[in-house]
Amino acid sequence: ALAAAFRGATAHWSGPRKGLIVSSGLGRRAMASQAAYCAGKAGLDHFTRCLALDEALKPHGAKVCSLAPGVIETDMQVQLRGADPAVFPDRAAFTGMKEKGQLATPDDAAARGLAFLNRADFGVNPVADVRD
């Protein structure tokens, strides 16, 4: 809905348009007990690939990218670190990232996303990782 609203509201613009969609590395990697999340993010990535193709057909089409922002300290992280290892075998990996200080803050992730949005090559790859 937001992508359609953006496209409709800016379709008449002759200047550059960019759309950044927040995805996840889990859209590209399967993980036990996270099927719905992984599938949702994978669908978002593929939607963005299709959207990029649609926009490329237009004279002033928007550049779009579904960006994996890295691992961020969120409520989801808290839930994953507290999950039963019998159903979430990756729990130790997430606990380790927290213990080693490898989780980005939401503010840091937002800053990295904005920096990615301003890269000269933004939109060349419709699905990317901020760590690329």
Regions found by a protein language model. Give the residues of each.
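Catalytic Tyr-X3-Lys loop
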Residues: 1, 20, 44
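Active-site helix of classical SDR
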Residues: 3, 40
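Alpha-helical segment proximal to the catalytic Tyr-Lys
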Residues: 8, 53-57
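Flexible, glycine/small-residue catalytic loop immediately N-terminal to the helix bearing the conserved Tyr-Lys
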Residues: 14, 29-33, 55
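Rossmann-fold scaffold of SDR-type NAD(P)-dependent oxidoreductases
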Residues: 20-21, 65
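Residue(s) in the substrate-gating loop at a strand-loop-helix junction
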Residues: 24
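Active-site loop-to-helix junction immediately N-terminal to the catalytic Tyr of the SDR YXXXK motif
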Residues: 30-38, 50
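C-terminal helical subdomain
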Residues: 62, 66-69, 74, 82-132
